[in-house]
Amino acid sequence: MNVRRLIPAAALAGAVALGATALTACSGASAGTGTDGKLHVMSSFYPMQFLAEQIGKDHVKVDTLTKPGVEPHDLEITPKQTGQLGESDVVLYLKGLQPAVDKAVAQSGVKNVVDAAKLTKLEVHGSSGHDHAHEGEEGHAEGEAGHDHSHGEAGEDPHIWLDPVKYAEVAKGVGTALGKADPDHAADYRKNTDELLGRLTALDTEFKDGLKNTATRTFITTHSAFGYLAERYGLDQEGISGVDPESEPSPARMKELQAVARKDNVSTVFFETLASDKTAKTLATDTGLKTDVLDPLEGITDRSQGADYFEVMRSNLKNLQKALGSK
């Protein structure tokens, strides 16, 4: 079983300082606002959009490069979006998740760029929670079962928003960065950030309490996006594919998962809403398991089990409790 990660208080406090350094190339000047009087923020995809909206509220106009229903990993930037990116006051993105965005941001010339990957510590997670590499360990069973994880630096997992504690660290940094870009409204950004942190703390408590006592600690999912969540709450994630949802599992990996399902009394194979459920259903049929949704929250659509981050995360919690046999 994964060892629950303990985040030192100093690391949590450090997110505020990181927010200042993550706002790059500011030249000591604020971003200014558009003709509508709002700070124009371009976000890379939904979790970044949600933070900007919750922290900026009425003071910001938030657009996103990844439209609802688009799988973020596969995003291609259009010329129109490139132009919009260059005209933004602030760009908020997560380096390592979307190569096309990384390239466009680097070429945009925008002075106020906030990289969420610099606001918390990224880790390496494999497809299997049983041989997961923890913080400070050298090496990793990279390419396990034929998977090639190309995200982040040295295969780091970018799915930080699925851990409410790490997402809170990012929120702190975003609040600090928006305040630096728009100092006239810095007090409101601090207030809104504090409100959001309170909600994320409550969500963390719900997950801790809701997953404390379960019949099994192992879950199988098509997309290995839940490494941070699993580690936070003492669970074992077994991914059919790696952190890239489009990668195909090898026959050996499918056979291994069948053995894991029997050994760990797994009842459910999870799939997501933005990618094909074919592989999940194949494995479920072969092993006599059920299927259900575990949403990596990379976008909100009419198929999502909730209208925003908090609603979908609580749906994920309920689905995990049911699958794991919460007592």
Regions found by a protein language model. Give the residues of each.
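Extracytoplasmic metal-acquisition and chelation regions
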Residues: 2-327
